[in-house]
Amino acid sequence: MSPRAQPRGKLANWGNAFLPGAYAGSYVNIQNMKPDAVIRDLKNSNLSREEQRKQADLLTKINKLHLERLEQDQNLEAGIQAMEMAFRMQFSVPEVFDIAKESEETRKLYGESEFAKGCLIARRLVEEGVRVVQLSHSIDGYDIAWDTGHGDIVGGHAKLAKACDQGIAALLKDLEGRGLLDETLVVWGGEFGRAPTSEGKKGRDHDHYGYTTWMAGGGVKKGFSYGATDEFGLSAVEDRVHVHDMNATILHLMGLDHEKLTYRYSGRDYRLTDVHGHVVHDLIA
């Protein structure tokens, strides 16, 4: 979900990559959101639910007959699954995205920002059994707001952090209060940090040698930090965690063995951690 602009990279942010097409995400822009229109072209205003069900069933039968002749077609299989999901979503999506059903106390807890609204919807989605929710943050419609390489990293990041703070805190408190936090892993981060050296003005260049991600709930330890950077804040030097280690740990917390979870693609079995990755057990409660 995006509170405003579509994240740069678009499908690369929520596509299925080499996983089956059914695992691709559904992009939702919640700015100026109307619960029955959060996903474009989801509703068919010309047919009743019963008529749509008949059409969907007929098309599914035709597609399955075609699939039998092909024996295997990942895109067609994904299309069959996606069509059924779309049918079900047009009746369930408006309900789960209608935050007006929340109490005034809950809405006040989260705040009025678009990002806070996204955090509240994320909680509602988790309650309804959605397995993965990705929420991106921008401000003033600027889709790469955190890219302050040439901007004011001090004032800019302070503004961005303030815009996120209440919604994030509310999400964690709300999940815990409803008994959902222990079974919901919350991960906050990006793909790199910011270097300690100047970019000419007040900006900072990309730094992938050492940066911070935080995790909450879902079986991780509370109230501690893991690892450390050098004296300049440039490179991780203590308890270093590679992105493959992080992914292996997340999968472990989800009950999946990253060494055994494979998908067949282009003639070979792929792992989400490639041939790398170790579970960081020190992070696990």
Predicted regions and their residues:
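Ligand-binding pockets and gating/stacking loops
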Residues: 1-285
